[in-house]
Every structure is written in C-alpha cells, then in structure tokens.
C-alpha cells in the first residue's frame, strides 16, 4: 500500500503540487494550519510538506511531529521565496547525525 503525501500552505504556493498527484491543503491562518497538519498525521500521511511561511506560525506543531517517525514534516519555500528555515533544519539534522556540519 502506498503512503500518502500532502502539502500545506497558502493557496498560491500549494496548487502546483496537485499536478504531481500530491494532496494539497490550502490554509489561511495558524489555527487552520495546525488543525490541518494534525488531521494529516491522524490520516496516515507519511510525508507532509509545509511552506516555511506557514511553519513560522505553527512551530510547536512542527516540533511535535519532528519527534515522531511519521509523518515526516518537511519545510519548503513558498512562492514568495525562501526563509532558509528548511535548509537550516536539514543542516542541523545532518550535523546531529554525523557530528559535524558537512553542508
């Protein structure tokens, strides 16, 4: 059985993912974003992409799922550009895994 992938963010940033067959969840506001990420986790989504702009407002929700195996919550830039939050998280995880920042 295939695992599901979803993307959460503002409408303009997430609609393009629909063409790739990814479930899209446009949100407005932090409360809606939190509820959407929680709903995806409960509905067995293996990967949840969240735009960096949305992630800024729901940091505690993102951190809660970082401690879990699934879903993998991955931050991506929005159509407004990157905040470098996602890349910083990748860098931190690599450093934690190998003991040194190789990026």
From Swiss-Prot:
It comes from the Bacteria. GO terms for biological process: proton motive force-driven plasma membrane ATP synthesis. Transmembrane segments: none annotated. InterPro entries: ATPase_V1-cplx_f_g_su, ATPase_V1-cplx_fsu_bac/arc, ATPase_V1_fsu_sf. Keywords: ATP synthesis, Hydrogen ion transport, Ion transport, Transport. The keyword Lipid metabolism does not apply. One of its GO terms (molecular function) is proton-transporting ATPase activity, rotational mechanism. Pfam families: ATP-synt_F. The keyword Cell wall biogenesis/degradation does not apply. Belongs to the V-ATPase F subunit family. Produces ATP from ADP in the presence of a proton gradient across the membrane. HAMAP family: ATP_synth_F_arch (MF_00312). This is V-type ATP synthase subunit F. The gene is atpF.
């Amino acid at each position: 059985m295939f695992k599901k992938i979803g993307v959460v963010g503002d409408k303009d940033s997430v609609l393009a993912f629909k063409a790739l067959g990814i479930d899209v969840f446009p949100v407005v506001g932090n409360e809606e974003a939190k509820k959407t990420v929680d709903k995806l986790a409960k509905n067995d989504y293996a990967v949840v992409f969240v735009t960096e702009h949305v992630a800024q407002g729901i940091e505690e929700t993102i951190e809660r799922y970082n401690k879990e195996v699934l879903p993998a919550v991955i931050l991506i830039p929005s159509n407004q550009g990157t905040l470098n939050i996602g890349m910083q998280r990748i860098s931190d995880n690599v450093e934690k895994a190998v003991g040194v920042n190789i990026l």
